[in-house]
Structure formats: structure tokens, C-alpha cells
């Protein structure tokens, strides 16, 4: 939920409609949305409020990014660029971020609301106008924005980006939406006979196939019982719609957590190298700006830390491999941990562009490692062939496998609408090939860490099970023993083992999965 704002940009003033409230006489659906219950014409964008004023820059920025996302861009990459270009900072940047992310995340709820309020199917609403209405609906139903400000500003935005004719339509639909609370709209757009998963899909704005998959994942990873799974599923889906906290990592050898704390962050309770930023721009912290620290989810930190903690058998210096290193987040932490351990690290990435990003990330660590007589290298190769080309070379291997990202939906608002069940087949083949290659590349006594940012059973337990049952040269290690918090205590609620599954609604991290496999001698 975004913070309350002043009425000039949509805050709820004294006496305004409370969040989720409903004015007297409100009614959704039915008839021309531009006319009220006696046929009288409703408030129009063309009169009497057509004012000579500039469009709110925050809403215009959100709309600009939303249209870019519709064309295939990623919100988390596009938004920072637009904010910089439009010089939107501080509270205004926070408002823009919540408006954009919320409208994208919750379009599975807002779309049926818009269709009913408009009295027509979405296919008959221009895509550009629909995005404007999604932004408006989020202000009315998902943010602490005063009704008059939400309607006025959305109509003004429509007039600028969609045209005067569209502004009248947007005005009518917005006023119809404002007549009901979010709870009332849910009751109207979800049929009383809807199946539980269909109801949750609309209520929490997820495709129904994801709802079903997450229910199976909670049961399959033993995070829920038959008695608790429905409540746990609701909490998990709700966490996907909550803005995540900003987690930072101090890369060992290059920065200390204390430096991040001095810059305004709080020490992480989960990660010994982590911190949490409760406000402000991470890029304003010198260590982050200089690449000695970075934004990284605590779950990702725990994966790298677990691999570094597990005992291995090695003669002399250890050799570590990050098999799928791009764009470099985990590689940056692994590099620091390798420096701490006096080990060499090879970061492999199949994409040349992403390999360049990894080199940029590891530049400072590589220089420090070289000064201490060790190597941190970046190579560009297909991870599926490294096991054949370098059999038994590495002592610690991370397979941060490409996946659907269903455990990180809170950070990637558009991902839930782009992924389909068909993605699982192609990804599953790749995941199995990468894990098999990683095992081949591991020396006897070494360890492979297979990780995904998805709890989907087809990307986690099924992959590990299919690969390991075909070979007798690996044994599972209980990953739960290696995932410890900042004080060194075991992190609870990771499942029944030997793999470990983190959950957004339980641990506050992304939904990271980890399996640790030791190569037998």
C-alpha cells in the first residue's frame, strides 16, 4: 500500500471517501455509463471540469512504462529510466512505482471491473485506453487516492494520451467504478458458483493455472497440510501483490554491512551480508553506486551462502563455477565469498550481452582476487556442454537455472501475464540438461547447488528427481542445515528436506528453491 498523499496528487483529504468506502446510491453496471439513474447526464470530461492544466507527470510516467510493457519491455528495467528522464524523485517516484506496479499486478481483478463498469467486453476497448483505465482503477480500488483526484487526474491523462473523445468514456467508466468498494466489486465480478481456484485467481489477480500450481507446490514441498493449504495459498498469492522491501548485499571483501547501515539501511535478520533499505534510492548509497554492494533479495543471498558453507573435499585451492551467471547478481556475491575462502571462480553465461554485464559486476572483485593470487574469470559458453568439456574440474557449482520466476512475481509484475504452462516443457528440458552438466563438471567430493526462483514442482523436485535417479554418483545433502540466518541459526519452515524451499509469505524472501547434491568419489 502506498503512503497517503495530499489531495493535489490524489491523497485522501479529511472527510473524503475512506479506502474501500462507497458513497450513497452507488451502483455498478447496466446502461450507459455516462448517464445516471434517471437518465440525467453524468459529469463529463468535456464540461464543466475541462481545465487548462498540465497532466500529472507521475501518472504520465506510469502510463508511458505501462505501454512499453505492453510492447514487451520489463517494468523493473523501464521504470528507472523513465523516472530519471522525467526527473521524478522521492515521494513522487514512490507514488509512480506503486501506481504502475499495482495496476499491472492487479489487472486480473481490474479488467472484469472495467468491463462491467463500461458495459462492454475488453475486446471493444482500445488497448491504450484500457491501460489508462487500469491505472485509474488502481487509484480507486488499491491506493489511498481521493475519488475526485483519481477521476480528475485519470481523465486528464486520457485527454492527453488517448484524445478528447476517449476522455469522456474514461470519465464515465471511472465514475462508475468509484461507486463501489473493492469488496463490492469482487462480489459482483466473481460468480457465486465459481470454483475456489477461480475465485482466488480474480481476488488475488493471478492466472488460474498459477493458482493451481502454487497450491500443488505448497503441498508438494510440505509447506501446507490439507487443512491449512487454502489459507496458506491465499497468503502466498497476497504476498505476490505486496511491494517487496529493498534488500541489499555487501559483497565480501569489497563492502561491509556496517557501511550500508551508516548509509541508512538496517541489518538483515536473515543474511549475514545483507541489509534492508526502508526508504530512499539505493543508488544514492556510495557502496551500491560503486558496485561494492548491490540490490539483491535475501533469498538469493541465502542460496549463495549455503553453497559456500557446505563442506567439500578439495586438494589445494578450490575452484568454483557459476554455470548460469547472467546478469551477475549471485555471481557478485559468490565472487566475494570465493575471495574469503581463497578460491577461484569461473562465471559462465551463454549470452554475450549478459556475459558483459557479469564482467562489469565482477570487475572490482576480479582485481581484488588477482591481488591475492586468485582468479575470477567470466566465460561465454553453453552451460549444457561444460560438463563434457571440463569433467570433474570444479568443487562448488551453482546452477541458478532459468525458470518461470513464479517465486518472484512481486518483483516482476508483468511476469504472471506472460508465462504460460507451455513454458514449463522447454524450461524443464533445459533445467535437466544444465543440472546433469553441472554434476559432470563437479569433482568427486564436490557439491552442486541447484536453485530456482520458482517453487513450481515441475521446476524443482521433479527436475532433481529425474536427474538423480538416472545416476548413482550423487547423494542429496540436507539443504536446510546450510540455510542459516544472520546469527547462524537455522532458518525455519523450509519443508521436510533434503531440499529447501523459501516462501514470500513465510520468510519475506522470493520463493527460492535449493537442492544440494554431493558428487561421490
Q: Language-model features: where?
A:
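S-adenosylmethionine
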Residues: 1-521
Amino acid at each position: 500500500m502506498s503512503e497517503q498523499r495530499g489531495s493535489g496528487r490524489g491523497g485522501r483529504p479529511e472527510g473524503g471517501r475512506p479506502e474501500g468506502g462507497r458513497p450513497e446510491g452507488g451502483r455498478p453496471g447496466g446502461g450507459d455509463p455516462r448517464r445516471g439513474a434517471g437518465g440525467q447526464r453524468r459529469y463529463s470530461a468535456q464540461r464543466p471540469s475541462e481545465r487548462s492544466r498540465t497532466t500529472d507527470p507521475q501518472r504520465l510516467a506510469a502510463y508511458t512504462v505501462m505501454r512499453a510493457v505492453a510492447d514487451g519491455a520489463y517494468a523493473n528495467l523501464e521504470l528507472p529510466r523513465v523516472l530519471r528522464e522525467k526527473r521524478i524523485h522521492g515521494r513522487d517516484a514512490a507514488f509512480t512505482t506503486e501506481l504502475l506496479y499495482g495496476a499491472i499486478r492487479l489487472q486480473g481483478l481490474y479488467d472484469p471491473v472495467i468491463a462491467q463498469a463500461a458495459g462492454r467486453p475488453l475486446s471493444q476497448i482500445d488497448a491504450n485506453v484500457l491501460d489508462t483505465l487500469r491505472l485509474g482503477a488502481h487509484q480507486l480500488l488499491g491506493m489511498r487516492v481521493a475519488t475526485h483526484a483519481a477521476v480528475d487526474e485519470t481523465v486528464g491523462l486520457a485527454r492527453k494520451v488517448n484524445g478528447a473523445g476517449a476522455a469522456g468514456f474514461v470519465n464515465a467508466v471511472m465514475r462508475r467504478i468509484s461507486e463501489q468498494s473493492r469488496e463490492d466489486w469482487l462480489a459482483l465480478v466473481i460468480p457465486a458458483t465459481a470454483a475456489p481456484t477461480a475465485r482466488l485467481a480474480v481476488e488475488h489477480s493471478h492466472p488460474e493455472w498459477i493458482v493451481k500450481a502454487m497450491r500443488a507446490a505448497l503441498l508438494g514441498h510440505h509447506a501446507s497440510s490439507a487443512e491449512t493449504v487454502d489459507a496458506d495459498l491465499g497468503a502466498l498469492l497476497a504476498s505476490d501483490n505486496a511491494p517487496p522491501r529493498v534488500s541489499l548485499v555487501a559483497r565480501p571483501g569489497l563492502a561491509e554491512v556496517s557501511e550500508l547501515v551508516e548509509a541508512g539501511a538496517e541489518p538483515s535478520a536473515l543474511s549475514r551480508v545483507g541489509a534492508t533499505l526502508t526508504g530512499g534510492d539505493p543508488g544514492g548509497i556510495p557502496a551500491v553506486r560503486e558496485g561494492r554492494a548491490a540490490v539483491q533479495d535475501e533469498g538469493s543471498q541465502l542460496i549463495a551462502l549455503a553453497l559456500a558453507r557446505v563442506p567439500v573435499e578439495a586438494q589445494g585451492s578450490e575452484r568454483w563455477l557459476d554455470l548460469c551467471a547472467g546478469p551477475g547478481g549471485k555471481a557478485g556475491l559468490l565472487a566475494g565469498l570465493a575471495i574469503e575462502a581463497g578460491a577461484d571462480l569461473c562465471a559462465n553465461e551463454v549470452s554475450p550481452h549478459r556475459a558483459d554485464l557479469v564482467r562489469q559486476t565482477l570487475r572490482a572483485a576480479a582485481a581484488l582476487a588477482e591481488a591475492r593470487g586468485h582468479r575470477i574469470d567470466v566465460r561465454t559458453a553453453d552451460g549444457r556442454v561444460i560438463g563434457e568439456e571440463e569433467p570433474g574440474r570444479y568443487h562448488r557449482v551453482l546452477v541458478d537455472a532459468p525458470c518461470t520466476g513464479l517465486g518472484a512475481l512481486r518483483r516482476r509484475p508483468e511476469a504472471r501475464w506472460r508465462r504460460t504452462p507451455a513454458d514449463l516443457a522447454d524450461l524443464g528440458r533445459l533445467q535437466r540438461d544444465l543440472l546433469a552438466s553441472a554434476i559432470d563438471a563437479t569433482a568427486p567430493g564436490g557439491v552442486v547447488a541447484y536453485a530456482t526462483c520458482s517453487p513450481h514442482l515441475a521446476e524443482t523436485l521433479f527436475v532433481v528427481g529425474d536427474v538423480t535417479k538416472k545416476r548413482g554418483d550423487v547423494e542429496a545433502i540436507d539443504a536446510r542445515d546450510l540455510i542459516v540466518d544472520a546469527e547462524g541459526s537455522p532458518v525455519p519452515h523450509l519443508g521436510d528436506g533434503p531440499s529447501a524451499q523459501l516462501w514470500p509469505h513465510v520468510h519475506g524472501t522470493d520463493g527460492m528453491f535449493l537442492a544440494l547434491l554431493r558428487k561421490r568419489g
